């Protein structure tokens, strides 16, 4: 017998085991998930989050989460994540979880829901289409195997323009002091992220939330490379995050440049420094994710030797009015 019930904090580990089994390339630790949920609870926007667990004979076999993203927030926009263990699929469990989540968002008056699946998941995308979702964007995981990366071929691209130097965030904190360094880093990220392709407009992220997100164990100040002017302004950035489920892998966060400094090769120069640093520390793989319409970044990653994986297809039901902070 299959039962669907609201999940409790005691179910978090079981739900995470299901998620990690279904999406091993994006596996998380329990600590990471707890940090993420705590960030949602503490966010001043008070984003909604609700989890459900599907059980067969008392065994957890599926999970769903309906939540709101503070970084692209609208009070009527939700995100749905759903996972069912492969050996329990085609039994109506995914449909039951979806129906439970759907009744929940209808009860809350949702006007937009975003959900998706890998293009290789034969059943998931047709299920979304039958329920009124339409494709709005694709995201590619790109993987670089560092054993084939030759830094010597990129020496020219690693040079920065006169008056700009590369420094890690860890070193910038030593130079400027912690508070000044955080402000400089935050100012760059706040502007650079505005033009990142996404399925909804970005909303403002407060400094406190920016810092809180980077208080988790995957953040490494020595893995954040910044381009800094003589005046101390951070004008470009490239982040490398630890992967706690695979210590031989790093994940690229945001690589971006402030608008006035673009088309000078700053982002590439910083990304290359991170790749060299990773190689020196015995890292075997670097992963990044790019939207299908981010053609320049996809082309650059192709040049660097990244290899595209099957796309994640993001789908949308309804549409909320754009909410810009």
Describe the function of each predicted region:
Residues 1-42, 51-55, 60, 157-205, ...:
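Short amphipathic alpha-helix that is part of the acyltransferase structural core
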Residues 42-46, 215-220:
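Short loop/turn motifs at secondary-structure junctions and domain boundaries
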Residues 90-103, 130, 257, 263-276, ...:
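Conserved acetyl-CoA-binding loop-helix of GNAT-fold acetyltransferases
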Residues 131-150, 223, 252, 276, ...:
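Active-site/acyl-donor-binding loops of N-acyltransferases
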Residues 193, 197, 211, 219, ...:
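Oxyanion-binding "anion nests"
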Residues 235-255, 260-273, 277-287:
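Extended hydrophobic/aromatic segments used for targeting, binding, or gating
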């Amino acid at each position: 017998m299959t039962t669907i019930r609201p999940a409790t904090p005691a179910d978090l580990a079981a739900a995470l085991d299901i998620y990690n089994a279904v999406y091993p390339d994006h596996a998380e630790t329990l600590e990471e998930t707890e940090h993420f949920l705590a960030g949602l609870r503490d966010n001043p926007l008070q984003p909604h989050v609700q989890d459900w667990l599907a059980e067969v004979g008392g065994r957890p076999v599926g999970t769903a989460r309906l939540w709101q993203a503070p970084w692209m927030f609208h009070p009527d926009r939700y995100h749905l994540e759903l996972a069912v263990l492969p050996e329990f699929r085609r039994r109506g469990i995914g449909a039951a979880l979806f129906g439970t989540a759907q009744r929940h968002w209808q009860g809350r008056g949702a006007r937009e829901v975003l959900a998706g699946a890998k293009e290789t998941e034969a059943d998931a995308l047709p299920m979304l289409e039958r329920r009124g979702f339409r494709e709005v964007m694709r995201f590619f995981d790109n993987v670089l195997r560092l054993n084939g990366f030759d830094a010597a071929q990129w020496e020219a691209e690693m040079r920065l323009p006169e008056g700009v130097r590369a420094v890690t965030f860890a070193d910038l904190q030593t130079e400027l002091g912690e508070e000044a360094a955080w402000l400089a880093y935050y100012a760059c990220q706040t502007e650079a992220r505005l033009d990142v392709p996404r399925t909804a407009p970005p909303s403002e992220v407060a400094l406190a939330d920016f810092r809180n997100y980077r208080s988790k164990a995957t953040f490494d100040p020595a893995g954040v490379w910044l381009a800094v002017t003589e005046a101390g302004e951070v004008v470009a950035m490239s982040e490398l995050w630890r992967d706690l489920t695979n210590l031989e892998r790093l994940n690229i966060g945001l690589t971006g440049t402030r608008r006035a400094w673009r088309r000078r090769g700053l982002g590439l120069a910083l990304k290359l420094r991170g790749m060299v640093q990773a190689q020196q520390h015995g890292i075997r793989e670097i992963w990044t994710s790019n939207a299908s319409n981010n053609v320049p970044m996809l082309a650059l990653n192709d040049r660097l030797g990244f290899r595209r994986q099957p796309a994640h297809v993001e789908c949308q039901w309804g549409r909320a009015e754009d909410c810009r902070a």
